[in-house]
Amino acid sequence: MEWRASHILVKDKRLADELLKRVKRGASFEALARKHSICPSKSRGGDLGWFGPGKMVAAFENACRRLSSGSTSDVVSSSFGYHIIRLTGRKD
C-alpha cells in the first residue's frame, strides 16, 4: 500500500484548528500550506509525494490509512506538531 498526501504542519493547536475550519469552508489547502506550514513541503503546497508504510510517524500514517482519496483529516498531533492531512492518492 502507498499513499500520496499533502499536509499543513504548525506548532500551535489553535492555529491548526483555525486552519482546519478554513479548509472545511472551502479555502485553498495549497495556499494555506504555503502561508502557514513549517514543513519544507510548503513550497509545493504541502505535497509530500508518494510514501509507503513506515515512512511517516505512526499518527500521520494511521490518519492516511483512514482517509479516502481527496478527503481531509481532523487535526493530527505528532512529535513534529499539528498536521492537517489531505490524502491525494492511494495505491492498494
Which role does the model predict for each range below?
Residues 26, 36, 67:
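Acidic-histidine catalytic/liganding microenvironments
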Residues 1-25, 40-56, 85-92:
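Well-structured core secondary-structure elements of compact alpha/beta domains
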Residues 7-12, 29-36, 60, 74-91:
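FKBP-type peptidyl-prolyl cis-trans isomerase
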Residues 55-69:
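Cell-wall glycan
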Residues 25-30, 70:
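Glycine-centered tight-turn and secondary-structure capping sites
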Residues 3, 70-71:
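Short beta-strand-initiation
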